[in-house]
Amino acid sequence: MKFIDEARIEVIAGDGGDGSASMRREKFVPFGGPDGGDGGRGGSVIAVADRNINTLIDYRYAKKHLARNGENGRGADCYGKGGDDITLRMPVGTTITDMETGELIADLTEHNQSVQIAQGGAGGLGNLHFKSSTNRAPRQKTDGKPGERRMVRLELKVLADVGLLGMPNAGKSTFIASVSNAKPKIADYPFTTLAPNLGVVRVGPSRSFVIADIPGLIEGAAEGAGLGHQFLRHLQRTGLLLHIVDLAPFDDAVDPVAEAKAIVNELRKYDELLYEKPRWLVLNKLDMVPEDEREARVSAFLEGFGWDGPVFEISALTGQGCENLCYAVFDHISAHSDAQRAAEAEDLAADVRFREKPQAPAAADDAGTDPQV
């Protein structure tokens, strides 16, 4: 199935039905009075997150989604039937934005999470509501309200703990295939990966994290070169970025330092917040470097790149160094999660609305002695 991570659709909620202006006409009831019922409400448009869906392809060509209108009210105090709601099922990780106002309507981060994105119109009132002591046969009634109408943008941002960055053929897909059960396409030509891949890395019982591999970036991606930088949105929810560098390129004219700097520049052009995320350097394909040259090549790269953060040396093909990297990643994610939970608990404690009422001190006389009986 083709991977689609962005779509624009129009959602139109149903209009409310009109109220009825009807009079009761019945044998032996000379003054029946008003009996017009209310109109039914219009159907709403509801978005639901579904973990069994992983693309927005259903909304790439179905551009308009309409809910049913409410029925009009009728005589004999009969209310109109409400319009049926329609449900739009979307992948977990989808954000819904109003294109006119820029308002973020919903961020679907949990399975079965539902959000109303267009509300149906209210039904009109029948003339039964306008009866009074001075107006016993009202002819007034109200029309139903129109349903909400919106143009919305759907964006899918995959949910992952760790994201992989790197040039095409840096070994990102080989790495995710080595440490997880993901089966990405792997070949010796650029842009083998055309869509994000997710893999679950297990480091022990009940100890795992999710890793995301996106198509490779090249210099000028911000201007649309290669596949552009559209897939970088899938790294916005991650807590850690692994910058994978090919330390043994096939072409001797390729400069790993220049390529690594180009990746960082493209990251910064796309989103400053993404650029400031924790980022580790992973030097890959060390199995292709002679052992007596490894230390010198690594030192020369780090000096040229000007990097002073965490560095890991691995071979995704042979698995060398991958286990230690995965354990370090899990420890980082666990520590970050614990710190986040502690901060949330602190915020909650500071936001207590009802505190225990303090006890009033016991009354005593001015002299401090028991009162005389």
Curated annotation (Swiss-Prot):
Residues 359-373 have a biased composition (Low complexity). GO terms for molecular function: GTP binding; GTPase activity; magnesium ion binding. Its cofactor is Mg(2+). It is found in: Cytoplasm. It holds the Pfam family GTP1_OBG. Transmembrane segments: none annotated. Its main location: cytoplasm. It comes from the Bacteria. Residues 128-147, 354-373 are annotated as: Disordered. Residues 1-159 form the Obg domain. Its EC number is 3.6.5.-. Mg(2+) binds at S173, T193. InterPro entries: G_OBG (IPR031167), GTP-bd (IPR006073), GTP-bd_Obg/CgtA (IPR014100), GTP1-OBG_CS (IPR006074), GTP1_OBG_dom (IPR006169), GTP1_OBG_dom_sf (IPR036726), OBG_GTPase (IPR045086), P-loop_NTPase (IPR027417). HAMAP family: GTPase_Obg. Belongs to the TRAFAC class OBG-HflX-like GTPase superfamily. OBG GTPase family. Monomer. This is GTPase Obg. It comes from Paraburkholderia phytofirmans (strain DSM 17436 / LMG 22146 / PsJN) (Burkholderia phytofirmans).
